[in-house]
């Protein structure tokens, strides 16, 4: 069956059919009405307008600001005299579907900025939008009696907008500025087919069950306390054990790959951040303090709490004369950093103000970039395979504003491509998306329910070696500038643990699980046997618990299973007499018996994992 074309793709830009017709644009790649990323961009943008049209009919006094698409959906910022709440979404959605059935053509026309100012003279939100539009002409899209300022792209008719779902209502400051008034933000999503929408909603339902904030509380892994501060996680014993297991695993993996452990201070003088450029380009994301000078006649020194670990590593490289024979020099640190995030974007462990990165910096010659990146990619492979993640990569290339010669940028970018090609990796290209100081590879992982998460980055940097004037002595006894590769594979322990918690739904594999097993003695006389087993495992750095309260056996078993540990071990007379254990295996969903020695050996083997 022939699919409808809803837009065109020309030079990686999506142009709707209305614009193409008005501007006489021909050719291009057709965007069909399906669930491709390009089609969903158009469908969701149009669904935002359909939602606004529905709200306008239900709340005639409504005024609208902007309604962009976002990952997996769209939103519209607006204000009404009668507050809109989550309870109203069902009614708005019903109105949207009724409007979609009317099959309104979606048309586009242009007017001058002056005409637009006059047209929307009684709408302060539209005036705010006009303030952001450059040029003397604006475009307006119209469907039925509803019209709004917009650049597009849009579908040709509302008949393409039946599969919509409104999700939640939130608050948002006008223009994202907390000094401005608070608007209402309504979120939704849309798909080309009913099946795709239902599949997505099912995924959201599953995601809610796996929410790391919920599981973190249930499993007593971490907590937040407003008195302590927003975005500052507090690790409880189970969470600290989980994190410690992950840190030990990654630490030994770095050592085996010839990385050298280092440690930098939490505070660095602002002078350092000025040299690096962070003081001028990143200051709003940093925290600063002052420390009094030893000389009372001099003013206090300003210090910045580090938002990243790289400056101390640069200093470590530069603190003595380096030879080309020392390169590549790989330094790593599990460094805690602080970054100021607005309270509205904080989200459990996924977005915090204090976090610890698996940070490494590789100092090398330009001709070593490719080989070093290959080694990092192989390291990435070993980690992602161990945790059961698929992942994809994207190279971001030179932006308009950048430092370094064309030649070195070309060589560095080509080195990244060659490294990926040599390992037969597929990758995307984000043209102009690199940092001003070098190209990079972004690593996005896919979890058990199909969501994608940005984690690691491999970043080539020509900037900091130049700013801090670090060099090595080459084979001709000349001073040469090294290339610096920033590299974080999991990104941060906090974020990665949040993702792991949701990926495994709290059922962590034995090698990182905080508690490997829970012993449930049937009676008091069986507790001593459980304690001996616990002690034997503890001597191998394996943590277990004993549930020996006065609760009934069934309740203790249920409570143990709620902890989502891999093994619940029941101990009664028979087990004590025969030196065995009765195991409830969560992963296999089986019950079986083993000798005490077999069980201890099994747990040890499952816990001894290398990357």
UniProtKB/Swiss-Prot annotation:
UniProt-annotated binding residues for Zn(2+): 310, 361, 486
Nucleotide-binding in keyword set: yes
Pfam families: HGTP_anticodon, tRNA-synt_2b, tRNA_SAD
Named cofactor requirement(s): Zn(2+)
SMART domains, alphabetized: tRNA_SAD
Subcellular location(s) per record: Cytoplasm
Reactions catalysed according to its record: tRNA(Thr) + L-threonine + ATP = L-threonyl-tRNA(Thr) + AMP + diphosphate + H(+)
Region named Catalytic: 211-509
GO cellular component: cytosol
GO molecular function annotations of the record: ATP binding; metal ion binding; threonine-tRNA ligase activity; tRNA binding
E.C. numbers: 6.1.1.3
Top EC class for this record: ligase
InterPro entries the record matches: aa-tRNA-synt_IIb, aa-tRNA-synth_II, aa-tRNA-synth_II/BPL/LPL, Anticodon-bd, Anticodon-bd_dom_sf, Thr-tRNA-ligase_IIa, Thr/Ala-tRNA-synth_IIc_edit, ThrRS_anticodon
GO annotation terms (biological process): threonyl-tRNA aminoacylation
PANTHER family found in the cross-reference section: THREONINE--TRNA LIGASE, CHLOROPLASTIC_MITOCHONDRIAL 2, THREONINE-TRNA LIGASE
Family designation: Belongs to the class-II aminoacyl-tRNA synthetase family.
Subunit structure: Homodimer.
Purpose of the protein: Catalyzes the attachment of threonine to tRNA(Thr) in a two-step reaction: L-threonine is first activated by ATP to form Thr-AMP and then transferred to the acceptor end of tRNA(Thr). Also edits incorrectly charged L-seryl-tRNA(Thr).
HAMAP family according to UniProt: Thr_tRNA_synth
Protein name per its UniProtKB record: Threonine--tRNA ligase
Gene that produces this protein: thrS
């Amino acid at each position: 069956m022939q699919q409808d074309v809803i837009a065109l793709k020309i030079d990686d830009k999506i142009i709707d059919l209305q614009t193409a017709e008005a501007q006489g644009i021909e050719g291009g790649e057709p965007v069909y009405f399906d669930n491709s990323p390009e089609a969903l961009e158009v469908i969701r943008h149009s669904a935002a307008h359909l939602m606004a049209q529905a709200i306008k009919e239900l709340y005639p006094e409504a005024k609208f600001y902007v309604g962009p698409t976002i990952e997996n959906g769209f939103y519209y910022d607006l204000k009404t005299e009668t507050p809109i709440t989550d309870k109203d979404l069902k009614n708005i959605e019903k109105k949207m579907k009724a409007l979609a059935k009317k099959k309104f053509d979606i048309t586009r026309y242009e007017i001058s900025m002056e005409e637009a100012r006059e047209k929307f003279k009684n709408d302060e939100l539209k005036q705010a939008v006009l303030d952001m539009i450059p040029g003397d002409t604006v475009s307006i899209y119209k469907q039925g009696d509803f019209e709004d300022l917009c650049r597009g792209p849009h579908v040709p008719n509302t008949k393409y907008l039946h599969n919509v779902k409104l999700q939640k209502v939130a608050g948002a400051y006008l223009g994202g500025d907390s000094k401005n008034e608070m608007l209402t933000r309504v979120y939704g999503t849309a798909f080309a087919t009913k099946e795709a929408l239902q599949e997505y909603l099912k995924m959201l339902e599953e995601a809610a069950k796996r929410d790391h904030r919920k599981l973190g509380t249930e499993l007593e892994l971490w907590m937040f306390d407003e008195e302590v501060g927003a975005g500052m996680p507090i690790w409880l014993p189970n969470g600290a054990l989980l994190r410690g297991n992950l840190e030990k695993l990654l630490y030994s993996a770095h050592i085996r790959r010839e990385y050298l452990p280092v440690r930098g201070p939490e505070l660095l003088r602002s002078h350092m951040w000025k040299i690096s450029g962070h003081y001028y380009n990143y200051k709003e994301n940093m925290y600063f303090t002052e420390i009094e000078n030893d000389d009372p006649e001099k003013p206090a020194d300003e210090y910045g709490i580090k938002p990243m670990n790289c400056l101390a590593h640069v200093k470590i490289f530069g603190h003595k004369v380096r030879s080309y024979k020392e390169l590549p020099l790989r330094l790593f640190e599990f460094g805690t950093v602080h970054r100021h995030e607005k309270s509205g974007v904080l989200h459990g462990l996924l977005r915090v103000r204090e976090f610890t990165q698996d940070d490494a910096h590789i100092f090398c010659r330009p001709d070593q970039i490719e080989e070093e990146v290959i080694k990092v990619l192989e390291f990435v492979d070993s980690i992602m395979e161990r945790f059961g993640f698929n992942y994809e990569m994207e190279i971001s290339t030179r932006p308009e504003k950048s430092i370094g010669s064309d030649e070195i940028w070309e060589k560095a970018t080509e080195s990244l491509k060659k490294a990926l090609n040599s390992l037969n990796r597929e990758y995307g290209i984000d043209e102009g998306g690199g940092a001003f100081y070098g190209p990079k590879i972004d690593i996005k992982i896919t979890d058990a329910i199909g969501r994608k998460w940005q984690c690691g980055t491999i970043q080539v940097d020509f900037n900091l070696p130049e700013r801090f004037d670090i060099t090595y002595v080459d084979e001709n006894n000349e001073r040469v500038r090294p290339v610096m590769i920033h590299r974080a594979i999991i990104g941060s322990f906090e974020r990665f643990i949040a993702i792991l918690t949701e990926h495994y739904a709290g059922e962590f594999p034995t090698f990182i699980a905080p508690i490997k097993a829970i012993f449930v003695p049937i009676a008091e006389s069986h507790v001593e046997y459980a304690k001996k087993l616990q002690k034997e495992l503890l001597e191998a750095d394996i943590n277990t618990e004993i549930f020996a309260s006065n609760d009934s056996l069934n309740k203790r078993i249920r409570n143990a299973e709620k902890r989502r540990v891999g093994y619940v071990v029941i101990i009664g007379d028979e087990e004590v007499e025969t030196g065995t254990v009765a195991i409830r295996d969560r992963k296999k969903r089986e019950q079986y018996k083993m000798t005490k020695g077999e069980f201890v050996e099994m747990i040890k083997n499952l816990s001894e994992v290398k990357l």
